C-alpha cells in the first residue's frame, strides 16, 4: 500500500511516496545502489520498501524473508534526505507490513540509537540460529563491532 505525503525542506515541498517496490527485474533498485552506494545483486527473495520524492527514488529498505524472521539486509537513504525523519518513517512503513515475524538487523554502535528508537531491542547472539548466527559469530571473532538487534512483530514505536 503506497502512502503519499507532502513535506517541506527549506522552501521546496517534497512529494513523498512510501511503498513496497514490486518490479520483478529490480533494475531500479540495482541502479540506485550501484550509483549511490555500493554493488548490489538483485535477489527476488527480498521485499523492498522505498521512499520517493516526486518520481526520484531517495531511499530503500531491503528485508530478506528467512524461515523464522525477516533480515534487514540493506537500508539506504540519500545523504541530503537524512536527519529529516524520512529514514524512520520508511523503516516504520516497512515493518508495519511485516507483522508475522520479527525483524533482525545488525547495526554499528553509532547506528544503535536510531534502531532502538524505531522499536528494536538488543538480541543476544545465542538466541539466533542458522546462517545468520554463523555470519554474526564470525564477524565478532574477526573483531567487527556490530550490534545485533531485533524488532518483535507488532512492536510499538515511539517517535
Residue ranges of predicted features:
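Conserved GNAT acetyl-CoA-binding A-motif
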Residues: 98-110
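N-terminal amphipathic/basic-hydrophobic helices that include classical n-h-c signal peptides
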Residues: 1-13, 156-159
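Conserved beta-strand in the GNAT
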Residues: 50, 56-64, 69-76
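A short beta-loop-alpha structural element at the N-terminal edge
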Residues: 16-28
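Short loop/turn motifs at secondary-structure junctions and domain boundaries
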Residues: 39-43
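Conserved active-site alpha-helix within GNAT-family acetyltransferase domains
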Residues: 109-136
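Active-site beta-strand termini and strand-to-loop segments that position acidic
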Residues: 52-54, 151-153
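Conserved acetyl-CoA-binding loop-helix of GNAT-fold acetyltransferases
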Residues: 83-96
